From Swiss-Prot:
Descriptive protein name: Low calcium response locus protein D
Family of the protein in this entry: Belongs to the FHIPEP (flagella/HR/invasion proteins export pore) family.
Protein localization: Cell inner membrane
InterPro entries according to UniProt: FHIPEP_1 (IPR042194), FHIPEP_3 (IPR042193), FHIPEP_4 (IPR042196), FHIPEP_CS (IPR025505), T3SS_FHIPEP (IPR001712), T3SS_HrcV (IPR006302)
Organism in which the protein naturally occurs: Yersinia enterocolitica serotype O:8 / biotype 1B (strain NCTC 13174 / 8081)
Superkingdom, taxonomy of origin: Bacteria
Membrane protein topology class: Multi-pass membrane protein
Length: 704
């Protein structure tokens, strides 16, 4: 072969897209054009080769994602087999000859007995259809469903790892792509298994059509006796069925191996994984050897065979057990060296540790980090809390809070704890409890007033105050339908957890904005606002930027509009070095958002005001130091002022509209700190944060 021919072949080999297109066109022509027996033999051999190669690939891949194109390959191979079946059927009916492979397969399987041949063919087809294909189809369906259900949790875990600095942005992007690819593959496999199932059904139909059509043609057109025609066409038909079903069986096994493969970080090929996991249980092999020995002692059983098998399995288990003991001793010696080398007391080496953790205790202690967001729930509630529903609720809460505040909250960890009280749950930030509550088995949580429940005749039990100024009641699940008809709001256990968690996250939102999170937000903006990011980093240090975002979020101001916030930092950052005052200027740049938020989209803002004398009193008590400014009001004046606020505002929960308190910009922050212990939910705004379109509706004025 000359160099030009080799170069031409190399070019064709590089254009795999053209090769696939040619293959698909060839499949179509195979169904239409008659093929000579020699070509059929070659194509049948190619079909068998493809199925064997695919089976070997399935055995040696480390993860199903390494062969993510398999669903498409399954479709192509199924079409190829069906086209072959059409071609061989045409040749059998027209010429009573479908090539050497078909005849040899048929003659070998039938073995001179038509009934035996058909029975063997049916057994192979039924095994493929009812056992392998049916099981693989179910596994693919469940895998697709579970893969989709697990996506939100995996995404949250990736977000948490990225914010904790465990992985960078690129690795997080790769992990998200892997999750998406995995979901798409299992979803495709769920549908692709229908090809294999349909192929098995088509094989059963084709064999009966071929026998019936062949006998009819042999008797009516070729003048053969019925018995002779049945013998000839049955051999060819069974051979055709076998050369189609054997590759189909191999590919069905391939599909089964791929969808049932459980991959992990240390996975290798399938044989190595199976061998590694089997030999890891020497006790099971020892017990198996004893059972085989007992089988050998049963009268009538082949004693010698079972004794040999019992000896092999028992000896293998004994040798593996000895090897495992030696490895455990070596690990214990290594642990002793590590602990003594670190200066730990000698008694520490005798502490009981699991085999998986030996030799790594020091590493775990050095690098173990607290969980940012943890929910501990009494283990008795595990069945009552539906995992999928709870996961959906938690994802919805994080999404809603992000859209409202712009804070990228970390993943939420749920832990069922046996040491907690009955029905108790605990919400912890950085593993420090900040809120707790109780879930009552067989009950729903209702936030409506007592009068409404009594009016409907629904018995209730008073619940604990999960949130300030909000009474809750427990109502039996028997009354769920009545609550729905009365349009009264109620919560399941999953909804109680997420509702309580949403308030906790909103209250402690500023704790989730640190330097790492600020850097992440800036990186997200670099693609569209590169120059702005460079300028703001030049003017405002990252630490000050973080503190500003914390102050905004701490007062329930969203930071999603990062462009306006950063532009305000650039505008005022060089003029104002005090972070508190700089935050006030940034708030004024967000006036449109603030007015829309607290006026509920209207032009009227119900508000309480401070008298000029009160403002002057507070202003004169502000002290400036090198460390910052603070309010130094006399305790008696503070108490008098708070008393006037209580008289003027009263109980916020009894007010229909959501009012605000408006003061001058220079004292706004100090007034907020002054009243937040009693009126945490009352927003404090400055006059500079109001747009021209807003009309203030005075509800009262605080005077001394």
């Amino acid at each position: 072969m000359n160099p030009y021919d080799l170069e031409w072949l190399n070019r064709i080999g590089e254009r795999k897209d053209i090769m696939l297109a040619v293959l698909l066109l060839a499949v179509v022509f195979m169904m239409v054009l008659p093929l000579p027996p020699l070509v059929l033999d070659i194509l049948i051999a190619v079909n068998m080769t493809i199925s064997v190669v695919l089976l070997m690939i399935a055995i040696y891949i480390n993860s199903p994602l390494q062969f993510s194109a398999f669903p498409a390959v399954l479709l192509v191979t199924t079409l190829f087999r069906l086209a072959l079946s059409v071609s061989t059927t045409r040749m059998i009916l027209l010429q009573a000859d479908a090539g050497q492979i078909v005849y040899t397969f048929g003659n070998f399987v039938v073995g001179g007995n038509l009934i035996v041949g058909i029975v063997i063919f049916l057994i192979i087809t039924i095994v493929q259809f009812l056992v392998i294909t049916k099981g693989s189809e179910r596994v693919a369906e469940v895998s697709a469903r579970f893969s989709l259900d697990a996506m939100p949790g995996k995404q949250m875990s990736i977000d948490g790892d990225m914010r904790a600095g465990v992985i960078d942005v690129n690795e997080a992007r790769e992990r998200r792509a892997t999750i998406e690819k995995e979901s798409q593959m299992f979803g495709s496999m769920d549908g692709a298994m229908k090809f294999v199932k349909g192929d098995a059904i088509a094989g059963l139909i084709i064999i009966f059509v071929n026998i019936l059509g062949g006998v009819t043609i042999g008797v009516t057109q070729k003048g053969l006796a019925a018995a002779e025609a049945l013998q000839l066409y049955s051999i060819l038909t069974v051979g055709d069925g076998m050369v189609s079903q054997v590759p189909a069986l191999l590919i069905a096994i391939t599909a089964g191996i791929i969808v049932t493969r459980v991959s992990s970080e240390d996975s290798s090929d399938l044989g190595s994984d199976i061998g590694k996991q089997v030999v890891a249980q020497p006790k099971a092999m020892l017990i198996g050897g004893v059972l085989l020995l007992l089988f050998g002692l049963i009268p009538g059983f082949p004693t010698v065979t079972f004794l040999i098998l019992a000896l092999l399995v028992g000896c293998g288990g004994y040798m593996l057990s000895r090897k495992q003991s030696r490895n455990d001793e070596a690990n214990q010696d290594l642990q002793s060296l590590l602990t003594s080398g670190s200066g730990a007391p000698a008694a520490r080496t005798k502490a009981k540790t699991s085999g998986a953790n030996k030799g790594r205790l020091g590493e775990q202690e050095a690098f173990a980090m607290t969980v940012p967001l943890l929910i501990d729930v009494d283990s008795s509630q595990q069945e009552a809390l539906e995992a999928i529903a709870l996961n959906d609720e938690l994802v919805r809460v994080r999404r809603a809070l992000y859209l409202d505040l712009g804070v990228p909250f970390p993943g939420i960890h749920l832990r069922f704890n046996e040491g907690m009280g009955e029905g108790e749950y605990l919400i912890s930030l950085q593993e420090v409890p900040v809120a707790r509550g109780e879930l009552k088995a067989g009950y729903l949580l209702v936030r409506e007033s007592v009068s409404q429940l009594e009016l409907l005749g629904i018995p209730y039990e008073k619940g604990e105050h999960l949130l300030p100024d909000q009474e809750t009641f427990w109502v039996s699940v028997e009354y769920e339908e009545r609550l729905e008809k009365s349009q009264l709001e109620f919560f399941s256990h999953s909804q109680v957890l997420t509702w309580h968690l949403s308030h906790v996250l909103r209250e402690y939102a500023e704790d989730f904005i640190g330097i790492q999170e600020t850097r992440y937000l800036l990186e997200q903006m670099e693609g569209g606002y590169g120059e702005l990011i460079k300028e703001v980093q030049r003017i405002v240090p990252l630490q000050r930027m973080t503190e500003i975002l914390q102050r905004l979020v701490g007062e329930d101001i969203s930071i999603r509009n990062m462009r306006s916030i950063l532009e305000a930092m650039v505008e005022w950052g060089q003029k104002e070095k005090d972070v508190v005052q700089l935050t006030e200027y940034i708030r004024s740049s967000l006036k449109r958002y603030i007015c829309y938020k607290y006026a509920n989209g209207n032009n009227i803002l119900p508000a309480y005001l401070f008298d000029q004398e009160v403002e002057e009193k507070i202003r004169s008590a502000v002290r400036q130091t090198s460390a910052g400014s603070y309010l130094a009001l006399d305790p008696a004046v503070t108490e008098s002022l708070l008393e006037q606020v209580r008289k003027t505002i009263g109980d916020l929960s009894q007010i229909q509209s959501k009012p605000v308190l408006i003061v001058s910009m220079d004292i706004r922050r100090y007034v907020r700190k002054l009243i937040e212990s009693e009126y945490y939910g009352l927003p404090v705004l400055s006059y500079q944060e109001l747009t021209q379109q807003i009309n203030i509706q005075p509800l009262g004025r605080v005077c001394l």
